[in-house]
Amino acid sequence: MKIVLLVVGKTDSKLMAQATEEYIRRLSHYVSFEVEVIPDVRLGSKLSSEQQKDAEGREILARLRPSDSTVLLDERGREYSSMEFSAFLQKKMLTGTRRMVFVIGGPYGFSPAVQEAVADRISLSRMTFSHQMIRLFFTEQVYRAMTILNHEPYHHE
């Protein structure tokens, strides 16, 4: 199974980018993992927040395939423990999911079109974090899930 983290905008923080890259490097031992960046549409434009969400939404939908198993990372989504998330990924792997896409929207969230197209949502926390931090947290959780599934001593209960 290939896991894609589809994100809007690049990471400005070198520290966050380096930490995320470290987990991506570690993940290569377990699963194909890729971060796909949609260019930030607000640069050089004067769009309203709704127009920006719509523009980002069109870009997100254009990158999704009909066969993808897609999940929005959204504060209103279902919360999982690390053990539950690892079981969720394992189920996807065992049911033959070829490409699993997790999407982090832009600063104003997801457009109505994206929300209608993608039913599954996961929340990493009820708290609000920067999108750059969510990239790191999510990548670490995927790595943690892989170590749980492989019975490796990274996660402690």
Curated annotation (Swiss-Prot):
Q: Which is one Gene Ontology cellular component term of this protein? A: cytoplasm
How it assembles, according to the record, is: Homodimer.
As for what it does, the entry says: Specifically methylates the pseudouridine at position 1915 (m3Psi1915) in 23S rRNA.
- Subcellular locations according to the entry: Cytoplasm
Asked if the record carries the keyword Disulfide bond, the reply is no
Entry's HAMAP family?
23SrRNA_methyltr_H
Q: List the NCBIfam families.
A: PRK00103.2-4
Question: Encoded by which gene?
Answer: rlmH
User: What is the enzyme's main class?
Assistant: transferase
Which GO terms label this protein's molecular function in UniProt? rRNA (pseudouridine-N3-)-methyltransferase activity
What is the designated name of this protein?
Ribosomal RNA large subunit methyltransferase H
Q: The organism's lineage?
A: Bacteria, Pseudomonadati, Bacteroidota, Bacteroidia, Bacteroidales
Q: Which residues are recorded as binding S-adenosyl-L-methionine?
A: 73, 105, 124-129
**What are its E.C. numbers?**
2.1.1.177
Question: Which species is this UniProt entry from?
Answer: Porphyromonas gingivalis (strain ATCC 33277 / DSM 20709 / CIP 103683 / JCM 12257 / NCTC 11834 / 2561)
What does the UniProt keyword field contain? Answer: Cytoplasm, Methyltransferase, rRNA processing, S-adenosyl-L-methionine, Transferase
Q: Which family does it belong to?
A: Belongs to the RNA methyltransferase RlmH family.
* Major location (coarse): cytoplasm
Cysteine pairs bridged by disulfides in the record: none
Which reaction does this enzyme catalyse, per its entry? Answer: pseudouridine(1915) in 23S rRNA + S-adenosyl-L-methionine = N(3)-methylpseudouridine(1915) in 23S rRNA + S-adenosyl-L-homocysteine + H(+)
